[in-house]
Amino acid sequence: MSCPVIELTQQLIRRPSLSPDDAGCQALLIERLQAIGFTVERMDFADTQNFWAWRGQGETLAFAGHTDVVPPGDADRWINPPFEPTIRDGMLFGRGAADMKGSLAAMVVAAERFVAQHPNHAGRLAFLITSDEEASAHNGTVKVVEALMARNERLDYCLVGEPSSIEVVGDVVKNGRRGSLTCNLTIHGVQGHVAYPHLADNPVHRAAPFLNELVAIEWDQGNEFFPATSMQIANIQAGTGSNNVIPGELFVQFNFRFSTELTDEMIKAQVLALLEKHQLRYTVEWWLSGQPFLTARGKLVDAVVNAVEHYNEIKPQLLTTGGTSDGRFIARMGAQVVELGPVNATIHKINECVNAADLQLLARMYQRIMEQLVA
């Protein structure tokens, strides 16, 4: 017997939606949602396709996700072409199977089943879908959220379908995320000949004590909801490639994943104070890609935990670990935000796959969440 969740996932995988190209995925989802009475508003910005869809009125539960995927890498290393979905030994292979076309299919099928059983549901059910989450994310969810906030749209609860699970569906639910702050730092020196160091000023030598002190800082100890803030140097570049030239500049890029114990301004102030302490000549640029957010126990978290316990008979861990997601933008609307999706073991990898039975289970969990919050 065919399964509508698997069939829709396969249809989505066949559309090679390399970010920010949607490749027809949203048209497919919109057709399904309009057929069950959703009003759909396309909200495209530049090269990114987005849509906001809703049905009903009142307290609002939105499901959020992205149709775009990362490049598949060397297609010859896949057991099957990455955009030709294949099921082997119960596993559905294809780029986007886990991140996150399987979740999108589960959301839509759950909505179809929910509406069939509750055609006059009490609350409002909504979808916020973008084609740019994996790349810059500049014209995706963040722009939709800004537009919705400008007209005072209501959003009480949001479930993001990112692959949150580790071993089985629902073993981990993300009820928050750390903030992300990147520093692009250039240390200025004076270029010269290595045989005449007194005529130059080596920025690598000057920066070494600063960097040594920077990496030794314990920024905080975290708290009951967040791990300790982490700082990692991601890129470092200097020199001309020649062994007889002292470089004139050193570029260092480092990233903070920070908890609610800190603010981005506190981090910036400490870094700048350290630069001044070491008397460095520098230019600095900051990129704040997301503030930390946390959804405490409440109606949404309780509904998600209930759905997982009902269908998988496990109590999920509530964690805030991992990278950023579009949940950071949606949280600005004051909504409770939680992430629940399939196992993430193969996301962005060659031979990305998801257990087909897990997607069926996920659709049932999503439907039960709808029933608890907007039926």
Curated annotation (Swiss-Prot):
Cofactors (names): Zn(2+); Co(2+)
CDD domains, alphabetized: M20_DapE_proteobac (cd03891)
Gene3D superfamilies named among the record's database cross-references: Zn peptidases
Superkingdom in the source lineage: Bacteria
Catalytic reaction list: N-succinyl-(2S,6S)-2,6-diaminopimelate + H2O = (2S,6S)-2,6-diaminopimelate + succinate
Residues annotated for Zn(2+) 2 binding in this entry: D99, E134, H348
Keyword flag Glycoprotein: no
Pathway: Amino-acid biosynthesis; L-lysine biosynthesis via DAP pathway; LL-2,6-diaminopimelate from (S)-tetrahydrodipicolinate (succinylase route): step 3/3
SUPFAM superfamilies cross-referenced by the UniProt entry: Bacterial exopeptidase dimerisation domain, Zn-dependent exopeptidases
Protein name according to UniProt: Succinyl-diaminopimelate desuccinylase
Organism per entry: Escherichia coli O17:K52:H18 (strain UMN026 / ExPEC)
Primary gene name: dapE
